[in-house]
Curated annotation (Swiss-Prot):
Gene it is expressed from: rplJ
Keywords: Ribonucleoprotein, Ribosomal protein, RNA-binding, rRNA-binding
Assembly, per entry: Part of the ribosomal stalk of the 50S ribosomal subunit. The N-terminus interacts with L11 and the large rRNA to form the base of the stalk. The C-terminus forms an elongated spine to which L12 dimers bind in a sequential fashion forming a multimeric L10(L12)X complex.
Protein name per UniProt: Large ribosomal subunit protein uL10
NCBIfam families, per database record: PRK00099.1-1
Pfam families in the cross-refs: Ribosomal_L10
Organism: Anaeromyxobacter sp. (strain K)
Record's function text: Forms part of the ribosomal stalk, playing a central role in the interaction of the ribosome with GTP-bound translation factors.
Family indicated by similarity: Belongs to the universal ribosomal protein uL10 family.
GO biological process: translation
Keyword Ribonucleoprotein among UniProt keywords: yes
HAMAP family on file: Ribosomal_uL10 (MF_00362)
Classification of source organism: Bacteria, Pseudomonadati, Myxococcota, Myxococcia, Myxococcales
Length: 174
């Protein structure tokens, strides 16, 4: 790779690192091409970048970005997973991926400016994702309206039952 290509890679990585809300640094050892391709597809479908990075280029690209505090962890085989909107989904996908593979190890992560370790990433993976949270919030907002509708309807239903019972009583009497 010549100098121009390296500068281009650094520029591209710097741009992505600057936009990233979450960046997970992992060590992808002993994975075959089919497994990595499957992981890349799952991450790409979730709009998450997965890059095997050259450590020196990644460290240079990280300067002046939110990823800079974890640049010292770019040692040995390094995969960089970056998400630009949802911070939970990459952790969930990687935790799921790691269940069957001992060779894939998370070193560290930076989530919205806060550095967390591998255990923190595992804990983050157990949290509800953005879509789940939105669904829960929508349900919580809709719940009071549903209860109110039931409360408003209940007295009318009770009155209708009383009137119906009185009508039946009068019909039986004659």
């Amino acid at each position: 790779m010549n100098r121009t290509e390296k500068e281009q890679v650094i520029g591209e990585l710097h741009e992505k690192m600057a936009k990233a809300k979450a960046a997970i640094v992992a060590e992808p050892k002993g994975l075959n091409v089919a497994v990595v391709t499957d992981l890349r597809k799952k991450l790409r479908d979730a709009k998450i970048d997965y890059r095997i990075v050259k450590n020196t280029l990644a460290a240079r690209a990280a300067k002046g970005t939110p990823v800079e505090p974890v640049a010292d962890r770019f040692v040995g085989p390094t995969a960089l997973v970056m998400s630009y909107d949802d911070v939970v989904t990459p952790a969930k996908l990687l935790a799921d991926f790691m269940k069957d593979r001992e060779n894939f190890v998370i070193r560290t992560a930076i989530i919205e400016g806060k550095v967390i370790d591998a255990k923190g990433v595992q804990a983050l993976a157990k949290m509800p994702g953005l879509k789940e949270l939105r669904g829960q919030i929508a349900a919580m907002i809709a719940q009071p309206a549903t209860k109110l509708a039931r409360l408003v309807g209940t007295p009318g239903q009770q009155l209708a039952r009383v009137v119906g019972a009185r009508r039946e009583q009068l019909e039986k009497q004659g």
